């Protein structure tokens, strides 16, 4: 199948979702050769990936991931019988690769949202293009990545937050590692990670590194059964909701995708400069994250609040972003968000 798919994609023909599933099955089972994988993902990048192609690939990755159980059930985005009140779980994640070198905003947001009573399955990896990926800062904060899936499950169930280290839970990705490194360009795999949370998080805030991906990935999330989510791109290049300028956003519900341009002033926040949000290496960013959780004020705290607000809306904890900001402020000022960090640290090192 993959040889035929390469020939078609080279001619700029789109694949159906079922055809993409067949190709990805070959890639992730080890049937496709490294040369075939490299040729296919390069041709796909040159043609441009469609919603159906991305969704098909994401379904295969999800099916082959080590599943993380929350409560009594494995959450599955394909299920029609999800009780959203009992099983709401959120992921706040970016594609990475935006090149802005900010501190780890979505990781900080995860602790804040968890402190507001939302179960968080934070899916992440080491750095792609910055000095510090989410896994790097989590490790620098003293949270162990060398844990079993059962420990991750226990963290989410007991602490309300767990870190899902992508390489440990997506074993079938090993067949694509070599070709990806050797060709050295962005491919479909750069956007699949945030779409393939092993806990099946039905609520999501997803940051992307290109504006044209906002509505495309919003439609992918809808295709995959997302209950509610936001896809965001800061017009300064950030794969987060930014405070330096406007943010292109798309809200996802089972019924529709709605896009708009969000301004920080809409929620009463002052704009800042990119330098105000810059990060450093893992150790420096860990100091920043802990400082915010301990109550330090400033633009870094503000950008966490604004991103947490939309996470709380996505999870149904807040009726609107303004209410979300109030809840996030309380989570930080009360020490509840810091307590989530300490609890997760303790559970992963027990």
From Swiss-Prot:
Instruction: Quote the subunit structure annotation.
Output: Homodimer.
InterPro entries assigned to the protein according to its UniProt record, in alphabetical order: Anthranilate_Pribosyl_Tfrase, Glycosyl_Trfase_fam3, Glycosyl_Trfase_fam3_N_dom, Glycosyl_Trfase_fam3_N_dom_sf, Nuc_phospho_transferase
Cofactor stoichiometry and binding remark: Binds 2 magnesium ions per monomer.
What's the name of the protein?
A: Anthranilate phosphoribosyltransferase
* UniProt cofactor(s): Mg(2+)
Quote the PANTHER family the UniProt record gives: ANTHRANILATE PHOSPHORIBOSYLTRANSFERASE
Enumerate the UniProt keywords alphabetically: Amino-acid biosynthesis, Aromatic amino acid biosynthesis, Glycosyltransferase, Magnesium, Metal-binding, Transferase, Tryptophan biosynthesis
For anthranilate 2, which residues are the binding ones? 180
- GO molecular-function terms, A-Z: anthranilate phosphoribosyltransferase activity; magnesium ion binding
**UniProt binding sites for 5-phospho-alpha-D-ribose 1-diphosphate:** 94, 97-98, 102, 104-107, 122-130, 134
Pfam families given in the database record: Glycos_trans_3N, Glycos_transf_3
Q: Which residues bind anthranilate 1?
A: 94, 125
Q: Which family does it belong to?
A: Belongs to the anthranilate phosphoribosyltransferase family.
Disulphide bond pairs: none
**Associated pathway:** Amino-acid biosynthesis; L-tryptophan biosynthesis; L-tryptophan from chorismate: step 2/5
Positions that bind Mg(2+) 1: 106, 240
User: What does this chain do?
Assistant: Catalyzes the transfer of the phosphoribosyl group of 5-phosphorylribose-1-pyrophosphate (PRPP) to anthranilate to yield N-(5'-phosphoribosyl)-anthranilate (PRA).
- GO CC annotations on file: cytosol
Reactions listed under catalytic activity? N-(5-phospho-beta-D-ribosyl)anthranilate + diphosphate = 5-phospho-alpha-D-ribose 1-diphosphate + anthranilate
Q: Which HAMAP family does this chain map to?
A: TrpD
């Amino acid at each position: 199948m993959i040889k035929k798919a390469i020939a078609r994609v080279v001619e700029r023909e789109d694949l159906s979702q079922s055809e993409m599933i067949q190709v990805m099955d070959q890639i992730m089972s080890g049937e496709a050769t490294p040369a075939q994988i490299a040729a296919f993902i390069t041709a796909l990048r040159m043609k441009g990936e469609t919603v159906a192609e991305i969704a098909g690939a994401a379904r295969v990755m999800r099916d082959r991931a080590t599943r993380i159980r929350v409560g009594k059930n494995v959450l599955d985005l394909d299920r029609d019988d999800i009780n959203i009140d009992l099983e709401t779980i959120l992921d706040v994640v970016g594609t990475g690769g935006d090149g802005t070198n900010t501190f780890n905003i979505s990781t900080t947001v995860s602790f804040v949202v968890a402190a507001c009573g939302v179960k968080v399955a934070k899916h992440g990896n080491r750095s792609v293009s910055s000095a510090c990926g989410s896994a790097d800062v989590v490790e620098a904060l003293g949270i162990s990545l060398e844990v079993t899936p059962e420990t991750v499950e226990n963290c989410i169930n007991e602490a309300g937050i767990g870190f899902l280290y992508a390489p440990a839970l997506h074993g079938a990705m090993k067949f694509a590692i070599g070709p990806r490194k050797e060709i050295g360009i962005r491919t479909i795999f750069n956007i699949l990670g945030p779409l393939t949370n092993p806990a099946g998080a039905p609520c999501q805030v997803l940051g992307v590194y290109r504006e044209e991906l906002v509505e495309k990935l919003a439609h992918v999330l809808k295709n995959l059964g997302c209950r509610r989510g936001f896809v965001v791109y800061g017009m300064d290049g950030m794969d987060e909701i930014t405070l330096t300028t406007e943010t292109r956003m798309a809200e996802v519900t089972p019924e529709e995708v709605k896009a708009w341009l969000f301004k920080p002033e809409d929620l009463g926040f002052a704009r800042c400069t990119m330098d105000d949000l810059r990060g450093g290496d893992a150790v420096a960013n860990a100091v920043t994250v802990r400082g915010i959780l301990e109550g330090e004020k400033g633009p870094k705290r503000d950008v966490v609040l604004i991103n947490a607000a939309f996470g709380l809306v996505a999870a149904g904890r807040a009726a609107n972003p303004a209410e979300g900001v109030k809840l996030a402020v309380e989570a930080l000022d009360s020490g509840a968000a810091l307590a989530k960090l300490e609890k997760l640290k303790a559970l992963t090192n027990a």
